[in-house]
Amino acid sequence: MRPSPALAGGGRTVANLLSATEWMLPSPATQVHTISVLPSHSPPSPPHHFAFSNLTTAPKRNGGKGEEEGRPRFEVVRDDLLHPLANGNKARKLDALLPLLRRRGATDVVTCGGCQSAHAAATAVHCAEWGMRPHILLRGEQPDIPTGYNLISLMFGNVAYASRSVYAHRDEMLYNHARKVAGTGGTVLWADDISKEDFVLDEDNGCEIGSRRVVIIKEGAGDVQALLGVIRLVEYLYNLSSFHKHENVHVVVDAGTGTTAVGLALGAVCLGLHWRVTAVMLADTLERYKEREKSLISDFKKLCHNNYHEMVGENDIGDSLVEWVERFSPRRFGKVLNGEIALCRQIAQQTGILLDPMYTLAGWEQAVDLCVGDSRTKVVMIHTGGTLGFCGLAQRYSSHFTSDEQT
């Protein structure tokens, strides 16, 4: 493993923090696929003017040379393959958090999300795996036919539905539900309230035997401890031989809560890497994302106490690490535009990689634009998973899912 640049100085580094952390995932390893961007030979109008080839999995022709030679390309970090049901950045954000909660004596976990929330489903699955009872609050009404992530949440967790008016006050809703779960003799704790010492010390949780200890995880796992799993991913990528020769690395990720983007940027800073992180804003305004970034960085500094400045050394550039950008076709969150499902189908058929039009397609389009515009930079897209969301989309946009004859 390559030593981090700050390690040579003898100070405490992020590597020390990561090595002292218990993880949910057995390994940070993930597949990285190389995608070649080709001019399209088919007639569809822009923006569908590219074709794609997966150079990692496609058979090599002509001794490995062909029309892909010299074409723009980018890397896709296949975190969608981490787990059959609960993968992507949803698993990364729980990587350090769930073992910590179990060690702290958590018996139950409460979180929330939309009806097809990948985060809620991931929390339900992984909590069940780790012996904690998951309680999931989903926005809206129960669908007539449970499918996709809604079905996964129902199978692994204890699901309740909240009206949109109640859901609008998330913190109050989560706390009230957690109090009901805890009962008269139980305790309720927010995940963000667990201090840095909890990462290195086993403590008596002070609960009565048999009582419930309920921990609340924010919507989308936007908690400071979620950053560590993402930073662990950055360290893993940094140590891959394919990344060694590239000083200029540009990482692209779609942003829901923005936590993953901040974790990627913090990981790069703490490891002394001159990586750029661009996040495609999908669910909020630029001002809100910047506020969340500032808050997460502040919480991370508190988590590390006096060790934060030793970790980042001269690399600290304040509270603005992420480049937040609009999606190429901005829209109200959750809306799918004409042609986007067809584009996801095209990409799946040409590369074997399934994207969803609400999240990962936005990151893919950004990565394509960057690699076409700058061949000197290694462009890396983080696949954040979420592909089971297609099950819900197929119900909402049934006319877009047809068995057209393939040519």
UniProtKB/Swiss-Prot annotation:
This is Putative D-cysteine desulfhydrase 2, mitochondrial. The lineage of its organism: Eukaryota, Viridiplantae, Streptophyta, Embryophyta, Tracheophyta. The modification N6-(pyridoxal phosphate)lysine is found at K90. Its cofactor is pyridoxal 5'-phosphate. Catalyzes the production of hydrogen sulfide (H2S) from cysteine. GO terms for molecular function: D-cysteine desulfhydrase activity. PANTHER family: 1-AMINOCYCLOPROPANE-1-CARBOXYLATE DEAMINASE-RELATED, D-CYSTEINE DESULFHYDRASE 2, MITOCHONDRIAL. It is an enzyme of class 4 (lyase). Its main location: mitochondrion. Signal peptide: none annotated. Its EC number is 4.4.1.15. One of its GO terms (cellular component) is mitochondrion. Belongs to the ACC deaminase/D-cysteine desulfhydrase family. Residues 39-72 are annotated as: Disordered. Keywords: Lyase, Mitochondrion, Pyridoxal phosphate, Transit peptide. It comes from the Eukaryota. It catalyses: D-cysteine + H2O = hydrogen sulfide + pyruvate + NH4(+) + H(+). It is found in: Mitochondrion. The keyword Transit peptide applies. Residues 1-34 form a transit peptide. Transmembrane segments: none annotated.
